[in-house]
C-alpha cells in the first residue's frame, strides 16, 4: 500500500510539473492566452496552424528554454541537497557545503571583470567551482584526517576564503559596469540564459541525477554511519566520493546556468521527506519534482511581479525563511 501511495505521489508531482510548465508559458510581463500557448505547442508537433509569429517567437525562443532551465536547476539543486544531507547525516546541509557555489562565484566575477562573454563566464564559474571543491577534498587528505567532520570544516574554510576573494573582486570592480553584473549574478537569475549552452550542460545534469537516484539506497546505508555501512559491505570512501562528485557536478552546472540560487537544495529535501518519509529511495525522486516545481514557480513570479526582473535568490530566500519559521513553530512542542 505504501509503494502504491508513493507511486501516486510521484505521478501527481510529475503531472503538476507539466501543468506548472504549461502555465509558465503563458504567464509573464507579456501575457499569452493559454489557447495560443496550446496552438503553438500543437503546431510544433505538426497539428493546427499555430499562433502569431511574435507569440511563437516568445514561446519557442524565450520561454521554453527558460522553463527547461528552471526545471533542470530546481531538480538538480534539490536532489544534490538531498544527497549531501544523506551522506553528511545532517538535514541542515545544503549543496554549497564544500564551497562549489562560492568558488563558482569567484570564477564568474573574474570573468565579468575581464569583460568575457557569457560562455566564458559559465566556463570560469564551473571550473572555479570544481577547483574549490578539489581544495576542500585535498585539505583532509593533507592533514591525514578524512572524517566527515573534517570535510565539513574544510568546506567552511574554503567558502570563507572564496568569500574574501569575492569581496576583493567586488571592491576593485567598476561600480558602473561590472559591479552590478557581479551582484546580480550572485543573487541568481535565468534572464541571461543561453539556450545553446544549455544543450551541453543538460546531459551532464541528467546523467548525474540518474546516478544519484540509482545510489539512493547506498545513501541510506551511508547515513547509518561509516562503521555500520562498512559492515554491510559498502566501500565507504569510494561511494561517498562518487556521490559527492555527482552532487557537486549538479550544483556546479546549476550555478553556471542561473548563478547562485539559495535555499532550494536545503528547503526541497525537507518538504520531500515530510511528504514521502525519510527513505532516500523515495524522498530523492520526490525532491527532484518538488525542486522543479518550486523553481518554476519562483522564476515565473520573478519575471511577472515587476517591470525589472526580481533576482531568484531574493524570492527563494524570503520563501525559505518563512518555511523554516513555520517548521520551528510546527515543532515547538517537541523542542
How would you name each of these model-derived features?
Residues 1-335:
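Alpha-helical transmembrane segments in inner-membrane proteins
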Amino acid at each position: 500500500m505504501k509503494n502504491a501511495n508513493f507511486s501516486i505521489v510521484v505521478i501527481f508531482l510529475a503531472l503538476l510539473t507539466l501543468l506548472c510548465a504549461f502555465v509558465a508559458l503563458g504567464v509573464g510581463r507579456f501575457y499569452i492566452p493559454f489557447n495560443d500557448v496550446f496552438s503553438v505547442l500543437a503546431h510544433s508537433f505538426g497539428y493546427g496552424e499555430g499562433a502569431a509569429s511574435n507569440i511563437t517567437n516568445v514561446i519557442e525562443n524565450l520561454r521554453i528554454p527558460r522553463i527547461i532551465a528552471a526545471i533542470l536547476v530546481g531538480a538538480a539543486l534539490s536532489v544534490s541537497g538531498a544527497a549531501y544531507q544523506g551522506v553528511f547525516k545532517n538535514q541542515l546541509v545544503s549543496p554549497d557545503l564544500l564551497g562549489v557555489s562560492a568558488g563558482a562565484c569567484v570564477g564568474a566575477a573574474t570573468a565579468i571583470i575581464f569583460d568575457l562573454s557569457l560562455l566564458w563566464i559559465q566556463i570560469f564559474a564551473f571550473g572555479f567551482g570544481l577547483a574549490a571543491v578539489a581544495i576542500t577534498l585535498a585539505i583532509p587528505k593533507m592533514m591525514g584526517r578524512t572524517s566527515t567532520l573534517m570535510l565539513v570544516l574544510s568546506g567552511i574554510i574554503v567558502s570563507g576564503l572564496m568569500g574574501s576573494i569575492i569581496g576583493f573582486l567586488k571592491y576593485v570592480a567598476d561600480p558602473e559596469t561590472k559591479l552590478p553584473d557581479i551582484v546580480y549574478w550572485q543573487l541568481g537569475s535565468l534572464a541571461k540564459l543561453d539556450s545553446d549552452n544549455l544543450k551541453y550542460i543538460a546531459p551532464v545534469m541528467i546523467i548525474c541525477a540518474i546516478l544519484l537516484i540509482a545510489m539512493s539506497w547506498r545513501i541510506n546505508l551511508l547515513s547509518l554511519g561509516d562503521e555500520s555501512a562498512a559492515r554491510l559491505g559498502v566501500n565507504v570512501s569510494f561511494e561517498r566520493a562518487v556521490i559527492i562528485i555527482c552532487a557537486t557536478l549538479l550544483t556546479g552546472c546549476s550555478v553556471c546556468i542561473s548563478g547562485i540560487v539559495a535555499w532550494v537544495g536545503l528547503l526541497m529535501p525537507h518538504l520531500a521527506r515530510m511528504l514521502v518519509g525519510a527513505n532516500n529511495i523515495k524522498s530523492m525522486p520526490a525532491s527532484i519534482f518538488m525542486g522543479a516545481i518550486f523553481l518554476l514557480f519562483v522564476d515565473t513570479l520573478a519575471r511577472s511581479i515587476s517591470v525589472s526582473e526580481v533576482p531568484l535568490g531574493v524570492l527563494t530566500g524570503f520563501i525559505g525563511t518563512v518555511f523554516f519559521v513555520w517548521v520551528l513553530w510546527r515543532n515547538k512542542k517537541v523542542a
